[in-house]
């Protein structure tokens, strides 16, 4: 018999230890649930409300943040992972696929590929769940595509009352806007409909370019392809520029990768361990060696190597090792100033042996501006650039600049685009590497450029910007988040207030405020709400 009415006992575990992919934190929830149906999710939420318990929903655990840490109830939807329906456009321009929200993105890839469809745009990995990938603002890198959530047609949510709520642009649009980037604080997404397109391959060019080449060509480089990203190696003063367009050409063998081999990977991680634990000053030399092994030494701008890959292989990437990650978004037009400032700071820090950075520093863009209305062109082809929108609503907690204005694809310039800069510090063989000095400087630089942090990453903040109880500086671990409540309230303003209003309406008993400290110190809830 189940220990919880309406939920099979096989879907409940005690003494479960949840660890995130990076191994930065773990949690021991009181109960760990893996429901198999929407009815079971409803039963869990209602029981939590009645018993005064709180719930965190987890998926693949790929967020390096501790936002999901809890010692109360934890729900994982890996067993709620079926495909429910595929509705195809009569003209074959797109299809709407409805899935249970626990399905992983890579599982959805397999289903869609077998039927000749693909997701329109992807982030760097496909391990996340369909419900989780939108909950923190996942994005790819393109001057035409925005947040992954813009592909979603509708959602079904189990809110804090234990009610099933259907959401789309016409039904509860305010709740839909909150749920498309909810941080798990509204309820549990149990079902989603996603707009997909006919499967396509990507013809990409990968070039080694000098750092100054990137800056000199900043005005045109970001709108030169539908998909584009750049990896910056400051100690080599070079970048790797990857650009891709849709194609009907057949896929070929993927590019060779030195660190993709067993030996190359082991050598790289071992050298990183040496720089972290024995001799930090070796870091620039190690990074130069690694760059030469992977990419060579010669600039190939305008003459890069080409490849044709499936959209999945082209857009996903190898994230290498366990890592701390701090990513911020700011207007793309501020990019040259930001990169020059970071470049100077990194060089000065290395010269003074103050701190050393790991590479690459990932530089990406997105177009999160939205038209007032959209109709898919009658003559849209498989290789046509740009999105087929699932909805035209901006999530309240979207961290990209809100003042940017939409332009048709033919008129897109840097003025429509958001710049994402991603600072990564590896944890070789699980070793915690110091990050505080580098990430603090990084955050100060991006904040001054109109930036805001990615919700799911390792942003630190400071005791001056946190809310709730704070400790003295020497009581914090180097990598521990301090909080950014005052800044977040300033940045998001009325959008945050509207999100909080929706959250209170959908979860009046605070069932989904499990990690209270994280939510308070980052301004998602006010501390007095916990006493109400």
UniProtKB/Swiss-Prot annotation:
Pathway info: Cofactor biosynthesis; D-erythroascorbate biosynthesis; dehydro-D-arabinono-1,4-lactone from D-arabinose: step 2/2
EC number in record: 1.1.3.37
Cofactors, names only: FAD
Subcellular location: Mitochondrion membrane
Uppermost EC category: oxidoreductase
Signal peptide: none
Domain FAD-binding PCMH-type, chain residue ranges per copy: 25-199
Pfam family, one: FAD_binding_4
Matching InterPro entries: ALO_C, FAD-bd_PCMH, FAD-bd_PCMH-like_sf, FAD-bd_PCMH_sub1, FAD-bd_PCMH_sub2, FAD_lactone_oxidase-like, Oxid_FAD_bind_N, Oxy_OxRdtase_FAD_BS
Residues modified to Pros-8alpha-FAD histidine: 62
Reactions catalysed, as given in the entry: D-arabinono-1,4-lactone + O2 = dehydro-D-arabinono-1,4-lactone + H2O2 + H(+)
MF-aspect GO terms: D-arabinono-1,4-lactone oxidase activity; FAD binding
Keyword Membrane listed: yes
Main subcellular localisation: mitochondrion
Family: Belongs to the oxygen-dependent FAD-linked oxidoreductase family.
This protein's name: D-arabinono-1,4-lactone oxidase
Organism: Eremothecium gossypii (strain ATCC 10895 / CBS 109.51 / FGSC 9923 / NRRL Y-1056)
Gene assigned in the entry: ALO1
């Amino acid at each position: 018999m189940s220990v919880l009415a309406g939920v099979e006992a096989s879907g409940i575990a005690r003494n479960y230890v949840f660890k995130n992919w990076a191994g930065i934190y773990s949690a021991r929830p009181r109960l760990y649930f893996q429901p198999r149906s929407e009815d079971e999710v409803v039963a869990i939420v209602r029981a939590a409300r009645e018993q005064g318990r709180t719930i965190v929903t987890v998926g693949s655990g790929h967020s390096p943040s501790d936002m999901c840490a809890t010692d109360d109830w934890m729900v994982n939807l890996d067993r709620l992972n079926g495909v429910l329906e595929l509705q195809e456009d009569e003209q074959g321009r797109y299809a709407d696929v409805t899935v249970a929200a626990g399905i992983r993105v890579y599982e959805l890839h397999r289903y869609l590929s077998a039927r000749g469809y693909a997701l329109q745009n992807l982030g760097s990995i496909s391990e996340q769940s369909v419900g989780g990938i939108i909950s923190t603002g996942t994005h790819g890198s393109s001057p035409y595509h925005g947040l992954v959530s813009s592909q979603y047609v509708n959602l079904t949510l189990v809110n804090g009352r234990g009610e099933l709520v259907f959401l789309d642009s016409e039904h509860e649009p305010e709740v839909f806007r909150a749920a498309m980037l909810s941080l798990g604080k509204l309820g549990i997404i149990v079902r989603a409909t996603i707009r997909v397109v006919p499967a396509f391959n990507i013809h990409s060019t990968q070039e080694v370019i000098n750092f100054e080449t990137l800056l000199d060509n900043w005005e045109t480089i970001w709108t030169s392809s539908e998909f584009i990203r750049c990896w910056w190696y400051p100690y080599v003063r070079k970048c790797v520029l990857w650009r891709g367009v849709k194609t009907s050409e057949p896929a070929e063998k993927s590019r060779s990768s030195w660190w993709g081999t067993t030996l190359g990977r082991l050598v790289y991680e071992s050298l990183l361990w040496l720089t972290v634990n024995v001799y930090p000053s070796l870091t620039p030399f190690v990074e130069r060696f690694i760059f030469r092994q992977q990419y060579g030494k010669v600039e190939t701008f305008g003459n890069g190597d080409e490849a044709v890959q499936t959209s999945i292989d082209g857009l996903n990437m190898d994230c290498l090792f366990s890592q701390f990650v701090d990513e911020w978004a700011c207007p793309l037009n501020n990019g040259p100033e930001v990169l020059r400032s970071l470049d100077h700071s990194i060089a000065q820090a290395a010269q003074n042996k103050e701190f050393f950075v790991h590479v690459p520093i990932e530089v990406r863009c997105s177009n999160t501006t939205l038209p007032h209305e959209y109709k898919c062109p009658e003559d849209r082809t498989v290789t046509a650039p740009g999105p087929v929108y699932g909805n035209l609503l901006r999530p309240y907690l979207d961290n990209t600049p809100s003042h940017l204005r939409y332009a048709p694809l033919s008129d897109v310039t840097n003025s429509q685009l958001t710049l994402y800069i991603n600072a990564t510090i590896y944890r070789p063989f699980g070793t915690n590497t110091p990050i505080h000095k580098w990430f603090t400087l990084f955050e100060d630089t991006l904040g001054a450029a109109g930036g805001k942090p990615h919700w799911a990453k390792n942003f630190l903040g400071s005791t001056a910007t946190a809310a709730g109880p704070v400790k003295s500086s020497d009581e914090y671990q180097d990598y521990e988040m301090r909080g950014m409540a005052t800044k977040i309230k300033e940045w998001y303003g009325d959008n945050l207030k509207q999100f909080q209003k929706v959250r209170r309406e959908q979860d009046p008993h605070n069932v989904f405020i499990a990690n209270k400290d994280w939510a308070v110190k980052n301004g998602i809830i006010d501390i007095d709400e916990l006493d109400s």
